[in-house]
Amino acid sequence: MTHLERSRHQLFPFHLVSPSPWPITVSFALMSFALSLGLTMHGYIVGNSVLFTSIILVLYSMTMWFRDIIAEGTYLGDHTLAVRKGLNYGFLLFVVSEILIFAGIFWAYFHSAMSPAIEIGGVWPPVGITAIGATELPLLNTIILLASGATITYSHHATIEGNRNHALNGLFITLWLIVIFVVCQYIEYTNAPFTISDGVYGSVFFAGTGLHFLHMGMLIIMLAVCYWRMRQYHFTTGHHVNYETTILYLHVLDVIWLFLYIVMYWWGA
């Protein structure tokens, strides 16, 4: 039932979601992923097969769930102004939770760096650890991320102004800048002079930058979906919630990376 037809019988602007199997499917898939990841890390052979199965199930369930959301908002007219506000508020709360996770990682880093234990030589970085220089690959990554923030803002303004070609070009450039960032980060990890097992320094460093790396992988998927939807004329000048949340996510990750760069690559090294 379209929004125009339903508005004759419904006295409120909210979307009453029809029964869906995807929330419970995603919940069980995530639980299976967490359990199998723990089993794999502790050397249980059965954990590998369950881990890959749960990853596939998570990706499939999330894809189908977002497919339904896109259909409800684009073709069925279910995303009224009130629903769009709710989606934006929900994503904002998700971003706040992500910021709090990184705040905990920074807390652990400062706790270890400002009061280094005697077991690591009483210095930071610990004795035997060669830190990655701030003027090496991390500086290039910082420039790439700042450039991506500029190109996505250009694309967003072009979308609002109805300039579809410029919006597509800006989004396409942004997508490839993020891909280059992820590749450079992978090269940095494979050539790093220390690992996640090298004491508290390696643990906190890879916990912070590695979590950001995983989020950048998620951002690539989100940008690719936005690019496909923009080419399919799913976005209008005033209705592009998916694009707005992706832009917010990119800017938040940009700011978090700046803190990571200043703290872990420049100050901490």
Swiss-Prot record:
It is a multi-pass membrane protein. GO terms for cellular component: mitochondrial inner membrane. It holds the Pfam family COX3. It is an enzyme of class 7 (translocase). One of its GO terms (biological process) is mitochondrial electron transport, cytochrome c to oxygen. It catalyses: 4 Fe(II)-[cytochrome c] + O2 + 8 H(+)(in) = 4 Fe(III)-[cytochrome c] + 2 H2O + 4 H(+)(out). InterPro entries: Cyt_c/ubiquinol_Oxase_su3, Cyt_c_oxase_su3_dom, Cyt_c_oxidase-like_su3, Cyt_c_oxidase_su3-like_sf, Cyt_c_oxidase_su3_a-hlx. Its main location: mitochondrion. The chain crosses the membrane at residues 21-41, 45-65, 90-110, 127-147, 167-187, 204-224, 247-267. Its EC number is 7.1.1.9. It comes from the Eukaryota. It is found in: Mitochondrion inner membrane. Keywords: Membrane, Mitochondrion, Mitochondrion inner membrane, Translocase, Transmembrane, Transmembrane helix. GO terms for molecular function: cytochrome-c oxidase activity. Belongs to the cytochrome c oxidase subunit 3 family. Component of the cytochrome c oxidase (complex IV, CIV), a multisubunit enzyme composed of a catalytic core of 3 subunits and several supernumerary subunits. The complex exists as a monomer or a dimer and forms supercomplexes (SCs) in the inner mitochondrial membrane with ubiquinol-cytochrome c oxidoreductase (cytochrome b-c1 complex, complex III, CIII). Component of the cytochrome c oxidase, the last enzyme in the mitochondrial electron transport chain which drives oxidative phosphorylation. The respiratory chain contains 3 multisubunit complexes succinate dehydrogenase (complex II, CII), ubiquinol-cytochrome c oxidoreductase (cytochrome b-c1 complex, complex III, CIII) and cytochrome c oxidase (complex IV, CIV), that cooperate to transfer electrons derived from NADH and succinate to molecular oxygen, creating an electrochemical gradient over the inner membrane that drives transmembrane transport and the ATP synthase. PANTHER family: CYTOCHROME C OXIDASE SUBUNIT 3, CYTOCHROME C OXIDASE SUBUNIT III. This is Cytochrome c oxidase subunit 3. It comes from Wickerhamomyces canadensis. The gene is COX3.
